Amino acid sequence: GGQQFSLAKSIGKNLIIYFYPKDDTPGCTTEGLDFKNNWDFFTDNNFTILGISRDSVQSHENFKQKMEFPFELLSDESESVCKMFDVIKPKNVYGKTVLGIERSTFFIDKEGILKKEWRGVKAANHVNDVISYLKEILET
């Protein structure tokens, strides 16, 4: 909580970075809980999970504690990381177009190379798709 994160310092780790729209909302809670419920798979296979949204550090701390997430949630209030991964997209909310985070997940390998991206995903069953892909690459 409250610490700076550096992608460069994560070389040597397999990263699963998922971007989600908002803390403590139904879809984002579902997605986070699916990552939590499959925590053993990720840790047993040396994957580090990071969730990112534009919510504040305090909001993340509250959400993480409430849901007992075993992984870190990173705050990107400035949208710099969101823009780097190109996940800020126009959305239609109650008839108005607003800019928001498109639910997306990225797999970055130990060398820091982007290996897979899932963009514009639905929260339900998304984590299963990620795990299926990772199981395939673990077998090769």
Predicted regions: what they are:
Residues G1-T140:
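Chalcogenol-based redox active-site neighborhoods
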